[in-house]
Amino acid sequence: HSVYPDAITIAEEVSGMPGLAAPIEDGGFGFDYRLSMNIPDFWTKLITDHPDEEWSPGAIWYELTNRREDEKTISYAESHDQALVGDKTLISRRADADMYWHMSRSSRTLITDRAIALDKLIRLATATTMNGGYLNFMGNEFGHPEWIDFPREGNGWSYHYARRQWSLADNADLLYHDLQEFDRAMVRFIDSVKAFHSLPIEQYHIH
């Protein structure tokens, strides 16, 4: 910050070391934010190991708000860890092959509708419980169906999957378009509320 006063610094760290995003004058490291890396891992495990009708609201609340109040954090539902080859995005874990064959308005299925609804719920819960900022990863905001795979020896140095198909989100006949519109409306709402990122978050009741 002494070199670039307007720079934004974000710490990517998994041990939970205190003080990373605390001011230097308070004994911290001075980062502006730290990534809430527990959140995407939690969502992945929850979707993989538990049917959604068994999800615990209390466990979800705890994981989304498990942080130090004096450190600003960046909340996110998923990132490159889930989108790279060998893994699956959250929506792909629910929709699976239907992501390729039933994402048009004329061929939608209960599987795709349920996967889309859960994906929206996950992102809304993650974004609205943030304490600093919310992060999207390229393409995840509209449920991109393919993984990312950069050119390497194992894929013959192919660029085929080193891409995002933005045209899917631009096509109003596809449900990818609806996902992007939801994400856009959610982010605009958050941005419209003054100091949303620092509003107090309280749990009143969990049924």
Predicted regions located by residue number:
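Conserved alpha/beta catalytic core and glycan-binding cleft of carbohydrate-active enzymes
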Residues: 1-162, 191-207
